[in-house]
């Protein structure tokens, strides 16, 4: 479950601006504010299924963009490369000192 939550957070961080205002709002309330589908539905006067549909469409849209661009995957690769460079720099500094 933790990996799913992380994945959803990364998708929203990278691609959230591509969503409609309604998709952003429902997605944020569900994943970040931890509101249930029923709570969101009650607040907006729509059905629980309506809220779920908006969130599922938002997830699908962001996943589709990631599947085409692989930006998040490349971000993680670069993070690993940066960590390796940082470790190498630390080792060099230790040798010099």
Language model: regions and residue ranges:
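Intrinsically disordered, low-complexity basic tails/linkers immediately adjacent to helix-turn-helix/homeobox/MYB/SANT
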Residues: 68-92
């Amino acid at each position: 479950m933790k990996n799913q939550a992380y994945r959803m957070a990364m998708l929203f961080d990278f691609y959230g601006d591509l969503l409609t205002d309604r998709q952003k709002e429902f997605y944020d309330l569900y994943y970040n504010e931890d509101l249930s589908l029923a709570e969101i539905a009650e607040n907006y006067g729509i059905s629980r299924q309506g809220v779920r549909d908006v969130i599922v469409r938002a997830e699908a849209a962001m996943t589709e963009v990631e599947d085409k661009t692989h930006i998040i995957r490349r971000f993680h690769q670069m993070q690993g490369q940066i960590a390796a460079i940082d470790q190498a720099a630390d080792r060099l500094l230790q040798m010099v000192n």
